[in-house]
């Protein structure tokens, strides 16, 4: 959920190097 940067701050991972595409906890498609 959210941007890759925001999810990264929540322990997630930015996917594809694209801002706005991230994963919260590496499990929730953002």
Curated annotation (Swiss-Prot):
It comes from the Eukaryota. Coiled coil: none annotated. It is found in: Plastid, Chloroplast. GO terms for cellular component: chloroplast. Residues 13-23 have a biased composition (Gly residues). One of its GO terms (biological process) is photosynthesis. Keywords: Chloroplast, Electron transport, Photosynthesis, Plastid, Transport. May be a component of the cytochrome b6/f complex which is part of the photosynthetic respiratory chain. This is Cytochrome b6/f complex 12.6 kDa peptide.
